[in-house]
């Protein structure tokens, strides 16, 4: 009996060891806790047009940057999204826009024909020419804002149009941080009473599914002007 017990124990430990190894490999492959590149600097692999399965006509590669050509006639049709969905993450990227430019980075985007554009579900880190935009901008429309929800603070330091900026979004179990050029400029808790009130009282009151998804795609916005992105990295939390 003792010998049989030892054999069973040894077999169980071996199985557990294999499972542990498999789980470790799975985490390594999915990049949990490690930085994963979402853009290889050469191709659009890993991205596709929102609600599209064909090629991406509005985007190209220039000098290692993913470039939006600004070919969309309006805010619909030219946005791209990742092939993979993310829940809790730290996302960082470098970006610049053209004079009078407007773009954004969205997360937790739900992709179905029900939604004409990513912004109907995905919160947006706003990117825009704060100075050269042809119309007066409200603070919630300016670069670094959690668009139409939370304003950037006094630590915001935006580089001139045409120069590279660095941005970051951290989403971890509803706690959200937005960073610009090394400074945390926005911080809030998704889905709390304050968040719900902002949604109900503002631009998103007519978009019932805005910001509710807990997992979704990352999206880069085409809003009619050239925008440049590189060093797009994500770490699953």
PLM regions: where:
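Carbohydrate-interacting regions of secretory-pathway proteins
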Residues: 23-237
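Bacterial Sec-dependent N-terminal signal peptides
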Residues: 1-31
